[in-house]
A protein has these predicted regions:
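Active-site-proximal alpha/beta segments of enzymes that process anionic O-linked groups
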Residues: 1-210
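Metal-dependent active-site segment of extracytoplasmic phospho-/sulfohydrolases and closely related
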Residues: 42-43, 225-235
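Short glycine/proline- and acidic residue-enriched helix-loop micro-motifs
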Residues: 215-227
Length: 235
């Protein structure tokens, strides 16, 4: 309604003291070693990325990178939806606590500690993080928080966060402070890529026509659209 600005809403604390007192988070204090040369941290997430679309055919670049990295195959997601999954990723808790944390103003321990250790925190979301209110629940104390990315389409916005981050790396890499970066891609969630990007998996729908979905339809074109979106995110 224009009564309160979106920036003020993100910073707003409802001061629900009872709610905060009921939350025993974290149960134990975090124990860590402070290094003279702290590591930079880059967290990249693809919204709605299904594990079945993680292979050499669909995500060759990510698969190649994963071959030389640690892979945690026993971890469970806190949800099969965007809101709950990102909540669990940062809080390491079930998404059942979403409402409690939303009104309490308590931030993820990860973000709190990064700020204490003087990390430069950069958030690069393709879709807005105002709704769902990730900006408020996860990053309300992060200075100069980026809550959205300009672009007419999901593809445009995904490309934009990549370009913006690569440009920012020139400054981040030459700075004296360590940095934490979170890039959140939306192509696999948006089911939308330009027609000339649909060549990898055919036949493919050009867009997700959910009205056509039923128990009798051949799902191949729909799945191929999804695979094309994930493959484009990988590229």
């Amino acid at each position: 309604l224009g009564v309160v600005s979106s920036k003020d809403v993100i910073k707003m604390n409802f001061n629900n003291k009872k709610q905060s007192a009921d939350l025993n988070y974290p149960i134990d204090s975090l124990k860590y070693e402070v290094h003279s040369n702290p590591k930079n941290v880059v967290l990249i997430a693809i919204d709605s990325w299904n594990y079945r679309a993680f292979n050499q055919d669909i995500t060759p670049h990510i698969s190649h990178f994963a071959d030389s990295c640690s892979r945690f195959t026993s971890h469970l997601s806190s949800s099969n939806g965007t809101r709950g999954s990102i909540f669990g990723l940062f809080f390491s808790l079930s998404s059942i606590y979403w409402t409690d944390f939303e009104v309490s103003g308590i931030q993820p321990l990860l973000i709190e500690e990064l700020l204490k250790q003087n990390y430069q925190i950069g958030i690069y979301p393709s879709a807005t993080i105002v709704n769902p209110p990730f900006a408020k629940i996860l990053f309300s104390k992060v200075p100069d928080l980026r809550t959205h990315t300009e672009g007419k389409t999901v593809y445009d916005r995904d490309c934009r966060i990549t370009a913006d981050y690569l440009q920012a790396l020139d400054t981040l890499g030459s700075g004296t402070k360590p940095f934490f970066s979170f890039l959140f891609y939306d192509l696999a969630h948006g089911y939308e890529v330009p027609k000339d990007k649909l060549y990898r998996f055919q036949p493919s729908w050009e867009f997700a026509d959910y009205m056509k979905l039923n128990n009798d339809i051949d799902p191949t074109p729909f799945l191929n659209l999804y695979y094309n979106c994930v493959a484009e995110a990988d590229s």
